[in-house]
Amino acid sequence: MSDFIDRALITVKAGDGGDGMATFRREKYVPRGGPDGGDGGRGGSVYLEVSPHLNTLLPFRFETHFEADKGLNAGRQRKRGRTGEDTFIRVPPGTIVSAEIEGEVQTVDLLFPGQKLLVARGGKGGLGNTHFATASNQVPRIAELGQPGEERELQLELKVIADVGLVGFPNAGKSTLLSMVSAARPKIANYPFTTLSPNLGVAEFNDFTFVVADIPGLIEGASRGVGLGHDFLRHIERTRILVHVLDAAGTEGRDPFEDFLTINAELKAYSSELAQRPQLVALNKTDIPDAEAFDELMRPQIIAWGIDPENIFPISAATNQGLQPLQRRIVDILREMPERITRLPYSEEILTFRFSNIDPNDFWLETEEDGVLRVHGEKIERLVSMTNFAQSESLERLQRVLEAMGVSAALFAAGVRHGDPVRIEKAELLWQDESIG
């Protein structure tokens, strides 16, 4: 099986919008042709898309930056630029996406194959000069730049989705059990912590398929993070049945029943809901002579603790002994459950992050560390990012909007005077004569 990676940090950049054009009709029989500059195309957006064929975030170890196509610039004769193509990034089911949106960290859980999450919106195309013609200005020499596409950092975290989670102390035989009931081939060796990340396998019994996750070995203190406990325990959260694998022969020199109590205490400390999940007990390594004595001693204790006698199975994962009754019981329990992980419904749902309902005309001022005032606000930031400062009419338009919105008055009231710098978006402007030019 390929390396299992369950955390990744990536950056995504949507495409910038294409620039609008400031051109005029130049035709023989049209003496007053007027403006004919087209609009720029919208930039492509970036989506995460759930793929049922992935079960790890390994691809993001090698590629961490993703961009969508830019919108094309406009043409003459009102020709609109082509829209940039969207980018789709495939992620496995069970991926949790976290991002900072408007100063708040938001998380979205992607579970269903086909489900999409819009993570970066493409920029709008800039308007051509046809939009700026007025009765008093019939030859506008002004066009907008394309709006920059959104860019953000995403934290990806995978919690495996499986029907059955194999839990137990290191070296209890979980990986061997997984390899015997499925086609998975996890690393197996006779020392603790051979498994450092979950292994997944698809098992089939009596024409019923189910997904099994071999969870790395837990130890005392796992619920507090000891021995990578938090990294391991979170992968159990989305399993529906727990199979507790015990070294019934005590080959590691520990008391198997004490191991049983310790693991269950850690499960309860991590999540009370997790501790209530259906649990089967597999008394493993029964092919070793000492196991029979431990079995006779442990079975009454495990039953007294609360495990149904029907849910206790002596097995030998190494020799395939006793595995069929265990699998039969797993299938019986899963058949009674309303949902099967292996049959997650396909979804065409497109999810988005939550954005505030702040009035786009609102703005506020912030003094930065060097004492320069910065203007924040959706509309004003978008306008500045789409202003072509090489066009005098664009500067005049910006000045009119600043004054109409009350930004100029607010800056003057805040103490800005002639020649002082003011920052809006990525631009640094100079205050001139009680206005910004």
UniProtKB/Swiss-Prot annotation:
InterPro entries: G_OBG, GTP-bd, GTP-bd_Obg/CgtA, GTP-bd_prot_GTP1/OBG_C_sf, GTP1-OBG_CS, GTP1_OBG_dom, GTP1_OBG_dom_sf, OBG_GTPase. Mg(2+) binds at residues 175, 195. GTP binds at residues 168-175, 193-197, 214-217, 284-287, 316-318. One of its GO terms (cellular component) is cytoplasm. Residues 355-433 form the OCT domain. Residues 162-335 form the OBG-type G domain. Its main location: cytoplasm. An essential GTPase which binds GTP, GDP and possibly (p)ppGpp with moderate affinity, with high nucleotide exchange rates and a fairly low GTP hydrolysis rate. Plays a role in control of the cell cycle, stress response, ribosome biogenesis and in those bacteria that undergo differentiation, in morphogenesis control. Monomer. Belongs to the TRAFAC class OBG-HflX-like GTPase superfamily. OBG GTPase family. This is GTPase Obg. The gene is obg.
